[in-house]
């Protein structure tokens, strides 16, 4: 019998993988992006940046920025019927595209 692994990155073999052409250092753009309170953002984990990484279970979720904590943003999401607040670095966030109103 083997003990089950329970680490932070366990069972994320495909989720936290970069494609071969994306490997290496990440561009500086996502590190310097700014978000405003109330703005909707997608949580998309950059596996090459370990600081400020949310738990992989929240990869792909959409939330709302409610504040800042140092360099990080506090993002409110709904998980089941509960609201949760995640502390996430901007490298792991993408702004939600707003549909153009005509």
Curated annotation (Swiss-Prot):
Highest taxon of the lineage: Archaea
Gene3D superfamilies, per the entry: Ribosomal protein L21
Compositional bias per record (Basic residues), positions renumbered to this chain: 1-21
PROSITE patterns referenced in this protein's UniProt entry, alphabetically: RIBOSOMAL_L21E
Entry coiled-coil feature ranges: none
InterPro entries: Ribosomal_eL21 (IPR001147), Ribosomal_eL21_arc (IPR022856), Ribosomal_eL21_CS (IPR018259), Ribosomal_eL21_sf (IPR036948), Translation_prot_SH3-like_sf (IPR008991)
GO molecular function, one term: structural constituent of ribosome
Protein name: Large ribosomal subunit protein eL21
Organism: Methanopyrus kandleri (strain AV19 / DSM 6324 / JCM 9639 / NBRC 100938)
Gene giving rise to this polypeptide: rpl21e
